[in-house]
């Protein structure tokens, strides 16, 4: 199944968090926070939000940081994804 987000929404897939700390301590699943870094899977067309035209600044494949409590979690083909507004993306990771 493929998801096509509407308006200024973006579909992202969380990137896995480190399982060990810098000092070598292995973290159990219950102690790990959900990562705030993700890969963009799909991007909406943009549009008008609150009377302003929104240009999409991210594209599929970008790695991004996003706000901790933003978006809606969904499950598609046994894959956990998140749909959020472009405003909830804090920055694009450039390598």
UniProtKB/Swiss-Prot annotation:
Task: Name the major location.
Answer: cytoplasm
Q: Which UniProt keywords apply?
A: Chaperone, Cytoplasm
Question: Cellular location of this protein?
Answer: Cytoplasm
Q: Pfam families, alphabetically? A: Cpn10
In the record, biological process GO terms are: chaperone cofactor-dependent protein refolding
GO MF annotation terms: ATP binding; metal ion binding; protein folding chaperone; protein-folding chaperone binding; unfolded protein binding
Q: Which GO terms describe its cellular component?
A: cytoplasm
InterPro entries in the cross-refs: Chaperonin_GroES, Chaperonin_GroES_sf, Chaprnonin_Cpn10_CS, GroES-like_sf
Report quaternary structure and partners: Heptamer of 7 subunits arranged in a ring. Interacts with the chaperonin GroEL.
Stated family: Belongs to the GroES chaperonin family.
Q: What is the official name of this protein in its record?
A: Co-chaperonin GroES
Q: Source gene?
A: groES
């Amino acid at each position: 199944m493929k998801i096509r987000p509407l308006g200024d929404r973006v579909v992202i897939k969380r990137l896995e968090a480190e399982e060990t700390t810098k000092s070598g301590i292995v973290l159990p699943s219950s102690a790990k926070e959900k990562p705030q870094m993700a890969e963009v899977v799909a991007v909406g067309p943009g549009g008008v939000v609150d009377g302003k035209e929104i240009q999409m600044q991210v594209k599929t494949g970008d790695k991004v940081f996003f706000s901790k409590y933003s978006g809606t979690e969904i499950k598609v083909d046994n894959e956990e994804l998140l749909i959020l507004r472009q405003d909830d993306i804090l920055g694009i990771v450039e390598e």
